[in-house]
Amino acid sequence: MTAAPDARTTAVMSAPLAEVDPDIAELLAKELGRQRDTLEMIASENFVPRAVLQAQGSVLTNKYAEGLPGRRYYGGCEHVDVVENLARDRAKALFGAEFANVQPHSGAQANAAVLHALMSPGERLLGLDLANGGHLTHGMRLNFSGKLYENGFYGVDPATHLIDMDAVRATALEFRPKVIIAGWSAYPRVLDFAAFRSIADEVGAKLLVDMAHFAGLVAAGLHPSPVPHADVVSTTVHKTLGGGRSGLIVGKQQYAKAINSAVFPGQQGGPLMHVIAGKAVALKIAATPEFADRQRRTLSGARIIADRLMAPDVAKAGVSVVSGGTDVHLVLVDLRDSPLDGQAAEDLLHEVGITVNRNAVPNDPRPPMVTSGLRIGTPALATRGFGDTEFTEVADIIATALATGSSVDVSALKDRATRLARAFPLYDGLEEWSLVGR
């Protein structure tokens, strides 16, 4: 005779979040409201489709699966093996790569694994200087990459704010790195991957391209692909790619064994199978015409914002655009000649309903918690459905705020921003779906 279910266990397992933990439920509801009613313009953020939320909130969160499909250290992996293979196959197809590892928990973990596979502690790593737009994992002294490896850096031209490939070559010839990283966190232009490949070959280095920010543009065919040129390519799955917060690695088959081993057991234990399911969904979406259209609107929106912020009324207030424009999804704003610093400008835009992040400009004189710049991104608004008309309005709100400064009519600008946000509903009906149990 089968025993009756324990009533206490049944209650906990079936009760909605709002009943089990009303504090967290209330905070989720507030955050949903914030995302709905503000204009999200942090370049590294995006909105995932409901299908990705469902995959990441699925029963796969229960499953441990150390190892690779067909070679697990746990039983019961017959279904998650198929999930991971789908994600790997979709990543390879989307980027035209020979192999893919979809297990990294983040872009930083992906970079850690690649460097683990390609070099040994104490060997030389050459990357873009953090002060010129590089990422923490490209050699910053407090990061693992700065502690494990001997680091050299290339930068941007002080006048044009562009990467000078002749200068990169000269630095590489002198420094003789084991690995060169081409990639960025705050650089608004397309990189010359062929030139980086040539330099790497000349000095006997491996080339890692970190395409975390522009992977979605590459997937849509709107940005040159680094895959034919690089030995290995790392990326996040959020940002322009529009999936959940996580990472992946693609590249040449000859590095697959070393990288797989560097991910597990080198850097991580068990993969997050619910997150990998979300990656698989995001990668499927990224192969669609609708996704390509979203990326076109992302690029167009960034150019509209850059153009508006270079207009005479804004320039007169001491605001400029780093490198004189953008080729990608973000605009880097220079406030060194403005009464506003980066923190003050971020706070001001937050008041009017636009979320951005303060960001250092090349060779910024201010400390990193203050900065002299802003990084403004368009992916999240393009995901909501914004086109040129809406981005023109957003650009004018930002321009008015930055040009006018602390005396701006915050209420009037916030009304404009809120109207725009509410014209493009986000996650309509999500409360009833499950998150807050209403």
UniProtKB/Swiss-Prot annotation:
Cellular component terms per the entry's GO annotation? cytoplasm; cytosol; peptidoglycan-based cell wall; plasma membrane
Q: How pH affects activity?
A: Optimum pH is about 7.8. Is completely inactive at pH below 4.0 and above 10.0.
Record site feature (Plays an important role in substrate specificity), residues:
238
- SUPFAM superfamilies with a match to the protein in the record: PLP-dependent transferases
According to UniProt, the reaction catalysed is: (6R)-5,10-methylene-5,6,7,8-tetrahydrofolate + glycine + H2O = (6S)-5,6,7,8-tetrahydrofolate + L-serine
EC code(s) of this entry: 2.1.2.1
Location comes to: Cytoplasm
Q: Name one GO biological process term.
A: tetrahydrofolate interconversion
Annotated pathway: One-carbon metabolism; tetrahydrofolate interconversion; Amino-acid biosynthesis; glycine biosynthesis; glycine from L-serine: step 1/1
State any single GO MF term. pyridoxal phosphate binding
Where is this protein chiefly located?
Answer: cytoplasm
Give cofactor(s), names only: pyridoxal 5'-phosphate
Which InterPro entries would you find in this protein's record?
PyrdxlP-dep_Trfase (IPR015424), PyrdxlP-dep_Trfase_major (IPR015421), PyrdxlP-dep_Trfase_small (IPR015422), Ser_HO-MeTrfase (IPR001085), Ser_HO-MeTrfase-like (IPR049943), Ser_HO-MeTrfase_PLP_BS (IPR019798), SHMT-like_dom (IPR039429)
Q: Which UniProt keywords apply?
A: Amino-acid biosynthesis, Cytoplasm, One-carbon metabolism, Pyridoxal phosphate, Transferase
What residues does (6S)-5,6,7,8-tetrahydrofolate bind to? 130, 134-136
N6-(pyridoxal phosphate)lysine: residues bearing it = 239
Q: How is the cofactor bound?
A: Binds 1 pyridoxal phosphate per homodimer. This is unusual in the SHMT family, that normally contains 1 pyridoxal phosphate per subunit.
Quote the subunit structure annotation: Homodimer.
Instruction: State its role.
Output: Catalyzes the reversible interconversion of serine and glycine with tetrahydrofolate (THF) serving as the one-carbon carrier. This reaction serves as the major source of one-carbon groups required for the biosynthesis of purines, thymidylate, methionine, and other important biomolecules. Also exhibits THF-independent aldolase activity toward beta-hydroxyamino acids, producing glycine and aldehydes, via a retro-aldol mechanism. Thus, is able to catalyze the cleavage of L-allo-threonine.
Q: Which family does it belong to?
A: Belongs to the SHMT family.
What protein does this entry describe?
A: Serine hydroxymethyltransferase 1
Give the species: Mycobacterium tuberculosis (strain ATCC 25618 / H37Rv)
